[in-house]
Amino acid sequence: MACTTILVGKDASYDGSTIIARNEDSANGEFCPKRFIVVKPEDQPRKYKSVLSHVEIDLPDNPLQYTAVPNADLKEGIWGEAGVNEANVAMSATETLTTNERVLGADPFVELTPAKGKEGEEGFEPEVAGGIGEEDFLTLVLPYVTTAREGVKRLGALLEEFGTYEMNGVAFSDVDEIWWLETVGGHHWIAKRVPDEAYVTMPNQLGIDEFDLEDAFGEQEDHMCSADLAEFIERNHLDLSVESTTPFNPRDAFGSHSDSDHVYNTPRAWYMQRFLNPYDEQWDGQDADHKPVSDDIPWARQPERKITIEDVKYVLSSHYQGTPYDPYGKLGDQRTRHMFRPIGINRQSQLAVMQIRPYRPQVSRAIQWIAYGSNPFNTLVPFFPNVNSTPKYLEDTTTRVTSENFYWENRIIAALCDSSFADTANAVERYQEKTGAMGHRMVASTDEQIERLVGDVTDEFDAEDEIGDVQPMEPDEIIEAVRNGEAREILAAANENMAAQLKEETDKLLDSVLYTASMNMKNGFHMSDF
């Protein structure tokens, strides 16, 4: 999918949480209705078959419960995209990446080969299944891992065994770590731990720009990779470093620097880092350190201040505000305003922001923030994932257009606001601020209820552990704590209350922008009947 990702290390976030976030965007000319659901262990398949590639995979018999944001129409498969499991591990999959001819020549994609001829007749060739891809990743991995590192290792093993038919970037997080995995060709992969004090920006381009192979084949403190990656690089002359002392650069070896990158990918990384580090360097003009078309914009950077949930929403909604490239702006001209692909684009399906909070009990520390539709016109609101079901307003998305579910209501609002951007901007901003504040209040009040139920967990320990976790536990203990039935009822009630308030405010916004857009219709006239 044509997506945009931001990852925020725990020391770079405003509250010590790990935060992973990604826009899921459809291909140009397509729109994809989404649902927010809970997948229970009994509903998880034991034998999985991909709709697109036809690959069949036997799955373990002990899945964890997890959330997902699948397609409402399953004709092309599940596409679970983002979720949190009962071990408080989050996963976002996938960011479609670019590659180059050298990589694909050395390790081609594993694509579905249809059958030729008719079975039983001379010359018949049976179908050959393809590999795994974005359709499959969340379903195949998230229910079976208890740490972010385990997520990397499980997906890596699946890639080596079954291969893939596309380039993908995948994020995993737990309370302590964030890992970013990038596929390389059909069967290879690399993964790097996001520095705690940094954030990562990822447009649709292979991003990791420095990789320690010695660590990946040794202690694996911050790097992991496929078993034969070093041999693969050497055999195919993929290391483009000029000097032997230069760190290996995967972006040069496995990625791309094409003309299309400079209108579709690099400008997005430029704008996100320009917003989060405005004073670190010169971003504009001929003497800029990095420009929208620069190929060397860093994969990871330390922010100038701590990053909030609202910052994440802003950068993932952005359309180059304050620059000549803003399609809604007054700077520049018609050429510049449509020069680069915006981050907040018309064909956004959903945005999922997964936050794992070390300062709350295991049962309530995970939050999955959700937005549907085009980000400049929607709102991001929190839901607790460790529940038995999700609110119908977000779950019961239909393939039929209706104002009765969150996805379609957002789609309608965005279409109305686009042509009346200036006239509806204030109403949208007020809606975003009000619903965002409602979300933070809901989280705070629910935290208080959970604290009364389970007690102040900080009293159970003499001191916080080395990562600031107030309730450090082994994975089995986390799962047991998260399955507290009474706590789940509290979290589910909070989610339902959030959804009810959200619908009320979204209905009000729809009413407001519909009136404004109707008044701006070209067939209006300033006189009425006498």
Q: What kind of region is each of these model predictions?
A:
Residues 144-150:
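Short, charged, surface-exposed loops that flank catalytic or proteolytic processing sites
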Residues 436-530:
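Histidine-centered catalytic/metal-binding microenvironments
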Residues 138-144:
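Short, well-ordered beta-strand elements within core beta-sheets of diverse protein domains
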Residues 325-463:
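Substrate-recognition/cap regions that form aromatic- and gly/pro-loop-enriched pockets
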Residues 151-160, 312-316:
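Short, well-structured alpha-helical segments that form the helix of a local strand-helix-strand
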Residues 15, 26-29, 36-45, 58, ...:
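C-terminal/peripheral segments of proteins
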Residues 231-364:
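Glycine-rich, aromatic-lined ligand/substrate-binding cores of catalytic
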Residues 2-134, 154-289:
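A contiguous strand-loop segment
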